[in-house]
Amino acid sequence: MADAFAGTWKLVDSKNFDDYMKSIGVGFATRQVASMTKPTTIIEINGDTIILKTQSTFKNTEISFKLGVELDKTTADDRKVKSTVTLDGGKLVHVQKWDGQETKLVRELVDGKLILTLTHNNVVCTRTYEKEA
């Protein structure tokens, strides 16, 4: 099922991203740059390993993981998190935990688009990606 997510995805719409970044503690200057950036997300499947690359003029990141296996990761905004990704009802659900906090990043395919919903406390951000040819 995760195979459906494979491909190169370009950000085309973003709602409430600045408020989300503020909620998780991202500083003002970083938020300003990140808000203007339109990243490309590349999802690759290699056996039971998923590789998630995010590329932008701001920063490039890469995470590789197996579903359900908790990893120690450093996020693009330098948070040290415990990170777990699962497949739930056709959605890739990514949970990050740090300092008693938790954020959830849910990726789902809707009408051929990749919808990323980020939630922290009561703040919800939606980012929409279209698949590149």
From Swiss-Prot:
UniProt induction comment: Up-regulated during hibernation in brown adipose tissue and skeletal muscle compared with levels in euthermic bats.
One term under GO cellular component: cytoplasm
Keyword Acetylation: yes
UniProt GO molecular function: lipid binding
GO biological-process terms attached to the record: hibernation
Residue positions binding hexadecanoate: R127, T128, Y129
In-chain residues carrying the UniProt-annotated modification Phosphoserine: S23, S83
Phosphothreonine, modified sites: T8, T30
Post-translational modification N-acetylalanine, affected residues: A2
Keyword Membrane: no
Phosphotyrosine, modified sites: Y20
Disulfides per UniProt: none
Residues annotated as binding (9Z)-octadecenoate: R127, T128, Y129
Pfam families with a match to the protein in the record: Lipocalin
Subcellular location: Cytoplasm
Family under the similarity heading: Belongs to the calycin superfamily. Fatty-acid binding protein (FABP) family.
Comment block on domains: Forms a beta-barrel structure that accommodates the hydrophobic ligand in its interior.
UniProt-recorded name of the protein: Fatty acid-binding protein, heart
Organism encoding this protein: Myotis lucifugus (Little brown bat)
Record lineage: Eukaryota, Metazoa, Chordata, Craniata, Vertebrata
Name of the gene this protein is made from: FABP3
